[in-house]
């Protein structure tokens, strides 16, 4: 096994885009701290894929709705991976509700996972990092308004502002950037056919795939002169 470039903590890394990012980071030379909450079997499968790349992987269960559990996550990871130098805030929840229909629990769930947890994870990550990078996974909706998913859209917008604010404060020791995917995967339980139908209205007239998101994440990590940037991986949907 070659010497790793460091270690990456990927939240929500058990499946979907998170699993693709975590596995790509392993291929790119990073050991991986794979966070999950309820998807234990999927996390174990992704961990095996990472280890097949010749890198170490450890699983970290944590409920990001719980502040105490969230506050303990980075210290737990550093016990296993002292060279933690990449944080990918990918964990997400996606629930439909307009402003009128959004209850307190749904609101807090979205803001806890999309904003509060990344805020405190970034804070803890930066405390003991002299050359690190944070990548926040957003959504192309941050460029507009989606009243059908009020809490989701607003919480992702808050994460975009955190990206910019943290980039200004934490440099040069820590760079902070974001990737905003568009039509990549349907929501859990959704169908690809619906995305393909909607993609006809995009400038590029097709849906993307997880490899497109992964490429943007790796580009940002590898480029030492980019911070505070958001890369839209959405086929032009944000235009």
Predicted regions and their residues:
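Conserved NAD(P)H cofactor-binding loop of Rossmann-fold oxidoreductase domains
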Residues: 90-95, 235-236
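Catalytic Tyr-X3-Lys loop
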Residues: 93, 100-119, 135, 152, ...
């Amino acid at each position: 096994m070659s010497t790793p470039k460091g270690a990456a903590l990927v939240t929500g890394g058990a499946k979907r885009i998170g699993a693709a990012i975590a596995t790509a980071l392993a291929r790119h030379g990073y050991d991986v701290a794979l966070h999950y909450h309820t998807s234990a079997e999927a996390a174990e499968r992704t961990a095996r894929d990472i280890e097949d790349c010749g890198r170490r992987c450890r699983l970290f269960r944590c409920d990001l709705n719980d502040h105490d559990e969230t506050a303990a996550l980075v210290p737990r990871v550093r016990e296993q991976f002292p060279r933690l130098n990449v944080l990918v805030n990918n964990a997400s929840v996606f629930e439909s509700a307009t402003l009128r229909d959004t209850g307190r629990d749904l609101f807090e769930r979205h803001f806890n996972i999309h904003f509060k947890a990344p805020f405190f994870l970034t804070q803890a990550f930066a405390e003991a990092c002299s050359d690190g990078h944070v990548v926040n996974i957003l959504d192309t909706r941050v460029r507009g308004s989606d009243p059908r998913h009020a809490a989701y859209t607003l919480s992702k917008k808050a994460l975009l502002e955190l990206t910019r604010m943290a980039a200004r404060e934490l440099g040069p020791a820590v760079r902070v950037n974001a990737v905003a995917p568009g039509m990549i995967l349907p929501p859990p339980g959704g169908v690809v056919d619906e995305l393909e139908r909607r993609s006809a209205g995009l400038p590029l007239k097709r849906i993307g795939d997880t490899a497109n998101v992964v490429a943007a994440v790796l580009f940002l990590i590898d480029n030492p002169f980019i911070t505070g940037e958001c890369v839209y991986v959405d086929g032009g949907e944000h235009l």
